[in-house]
Amino acid sequence: MFIPKANRVAIYEYLFKEGVLVAKKDSPIQKHSELDKIPNLQVIKVMQSLNSRGWVKEQFAWRHFYWLLTNEGIEELRRYLHLPPEIVPSTLTQTTRSNAVRPRGGPGGPGGGFGGASKTDDDRSNYRRGPGAYGMDKKGDVGAGTGRVEYRGGFGRASRYDN
């Protein structure tokens, strides 16, 4: 497939800048979602070419192609685009995180968990010893073992007492 050099260079530059490229597997799409003026089919074909050379690693999931730039691909694209070695894809750059002090508290510590001071062991034992805990009998006639089990025939079953 003939692809204009300007489109090919634009795809290479975007791939080198980001380090990854995504394209939907849908031929009728006229334009690629990230590269505005380049048809989606041309992006897919250029990336298939780079995959066959071993410059990118291809993955496919849920009707989308994902191409990841390999180390060999970084070197070759750097040479093709005449870029200095200081420029690297954004997937290889390290983000600087600010080491802001965040309050860290476990149970009973400062910050205490979900919404306030944590309960102590005394609070728990007082709750368990509250009214009706040990000495009082809650209703004795409720529960699973109070009634007599009765077998009755249901729909589509023979009665147990049919002979």
UniProtKB/Swiss-Prot annotation:
Signal peptide extent: none
GO MF entry, a single one: structural constituent of ribosome
Main subcellular location: cytoplasm
GO cellular component: a single term: cytosolic small ribosomal subunit
Alphabetically ordered keywords of this record: Cytoplasm, Ribonucleoprotein, Ribosomal protein
A single BP term in Gene Ontology: cytoplasmic translation
Biased composition (Gly residues): 105-116
Subcellular location: Cytoplasm
Region (Disordered), start-end ranges: 92-163
Keyword field contains Secreted: no
Pfam families: S10_plectin
Family of this protein: Belongs to the eukaryotic ribosomal protein eS10 family.
Name the record gives this protein: Small ribosomal subunit protein eS10A
